[in-house]
């Protein structure tokens, strides 16, 4: 690879690091081109999957200020640059790794911090953003309904008490004075 080509490749990788919300690092040794194409299809919309030389990735990462990942760049390395929800991309990679034992998750980088394999898998086990928001909305709806019931309770209790007193007075004989 010519020096100019390397500089272009480093610039492209650095740009992908800058644009990504997270980067998931994998080893793809033993996967076929068809397997890699299948993995890329499963990541559609949430991430792009790129294979690059380790030295170029290290250089690009240091250019954008990403530290602590050098030990992950050994062997055939590919990176999923996540532009959407990290949960979706992590789920897709974890699912693919279960089906294809040749794909090994090495770690990742998110919010300025390196991630271990366990952290990437924990993110993959989370529910999607939409599901979590729906659960939050449901919990809030229940809480609001309880609060409204509590606020309305004194008023409704007073109304029932007044109605009971009126009924009681209606059935009592008028007192003679």
Swiss-Prot record:
Belongs to the universal ribosomal protein uL10 family. One of its GO terms (biological process) is translation. The keyword Ribonucleoprotein applies. Keywords: Ribonucleoprotein, Ribosomal protein, RNA-binding, rRNA-binding. One of its GO terms (molecular function) is structural constituent of ribosome. Forms part of the ribosomal stalk, playing a central role in the interaction of the ribosome with GTP-bound translation factors. Part of the ribosomal stalk of the 50S ribosomal subunit. The N-terminus interacts with L11 and the large rRNA to form the base of the stalk. The C-terminus forms an elongated spine to which L12 dimers bind in a sequential fashion forming a multimeric L10(L12)X complex. Transmembrane segments: none annotated. It comes from the Bacteria. PROSITE patterns: RIBOSOMAL_L10. This is Large ribosomal subunit protein uL10. The gene is rplJ. SUPFAM superfamilies: Ribosomal protein L10-like. GO terms for cellular component: large ribosomal subunit. Signal peptide: none annotated.
């Amino acid at each position: 690879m010519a020096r100019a080509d390397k500089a272009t490749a480093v610039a492209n990788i650095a740009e992908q690091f800058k644009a990504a919300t997270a980067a998931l690092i994998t080893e793809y040794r033993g996967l076929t081109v068809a397997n890699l194409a299948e993995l890329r299809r499963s990541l559609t919309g949430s991430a792009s999957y790129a294979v690059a030389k380790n030295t170029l990735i290290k250089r690009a990462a240091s250019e954008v200020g990403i530290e602590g990942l050098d030990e992950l760049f050994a062997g055939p390395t590919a990176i999923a640059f996540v532009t959407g929800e990290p949960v979706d991309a992590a789920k897709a990679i974890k699912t693919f790794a279960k089906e294809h034992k040749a794909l090994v998750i090495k770690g990742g980088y998110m919010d300025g911090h390196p991630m271990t394999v366990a952290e990437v898998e924990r993110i993959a086990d989370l529910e999607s953003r939409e599901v979590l928001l729906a659960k939050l909305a449901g919990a809030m709806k229940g809480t609001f309904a309880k609060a409204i019931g509590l606020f309305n309770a004194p008023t409704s209790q007073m109304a029932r008490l007044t109605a009971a007193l009126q009924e009681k007075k209606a059935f009592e004989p008028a007192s003679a004075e």
